[in-house]
């Protein structure tokens, strides 16, 4: 398996130069603020060979009916006690080595009064009751995901989605996610499979809705796909260009778990946590050819990099996931800049990291007639100390108490049972500098009840 190297500084593109400060808060979240600065020096690794890009085309394409015309989901025979678990597990599992380094940015004081203004509007969105009403069961985890455009709010959860206007009026839905791909050439996309993501592309005035496929988990002869729908206009209730991109690498059918999406100037970027049928594990990084997709070109291309998680020199650098940058605001990233992708590493986890850090990767892609692409580790930024692996028992995830809640089945998902930052990685270009903001769950003090 090919491995990584740092991209040389004489490449004909501009780097995003980043200085990071990590703000860890008492609610078990860490806000990571990154501003432009001269680059930190990457720690040396044993590998200097480049990761190999794999280019391919969409395996299927068509245009959907108008979303507003899709029928609402039909209610099936309900079982109030049934809870569908969507938690495919694979790959290594980060284990805590105890509360060692602590929270180096723990805040001991809080403002005397709230400093955030009251919301302008509050309305009910989707819930697990919508799953119950459509499928006859509830789903865990719900994986809520939403995006705001100029005139709409689109929300997706496992396994339904809906469109609202800015006043909170329901315009379409709730609809089961698979209905968006009804009669598509890849039948697996028509199943409501889970892990949906919705993005609004403010540069193109388009909506992106997605999900993965899961039928290959029960049939090792079947591959997996990222199912991606791009609205044909700025109206999220209209028609969509539908695409399917296969995730197979080196003949291995990789399941693209935990997909996270980002928007850039000429690419849509996906990062996934991938595992194969036996011990195969790694992080998938994809770029999709944006200009062809928004114009409904069936020959839209993709490129994939696979970072091998079974390589002990690479595992500390990627842990359980990377996040692609996703811009906020109207100012585009600078022309020909690499796309920043961020991961975290924790020296108190069991993946071999020797210090706490943010790992900054650069993804570069040119969609020429013969495309070129590269992915490499730009730098590692040391952070204040943190522990990201909670001592969660008896479950692996749902163990964070809530005020007034005594039923342990209603405790919160800690979101840090693995070593990874959490969606999104918000990018903003302020013209004079650029910034990136994301989150990392941490154990603020020993024990879950104090996190």
Question: How should each PLM-predicted stretch be described?
Answer:
Residues 1-16:
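N-terminal secretory signal peptides that target proteins for export/translocation
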Residues 6, 21, 111-114:
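Short amphipathic alpha-helical "recognition" segments used for binding
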Residues 19-35:
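Bacterial N-terminal signal peptides
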Residues 32-46:
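Signal peptide processing junction and immediate N-terminal pro/mature segment
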Residues 42-451:
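C-terminal PAP-associated
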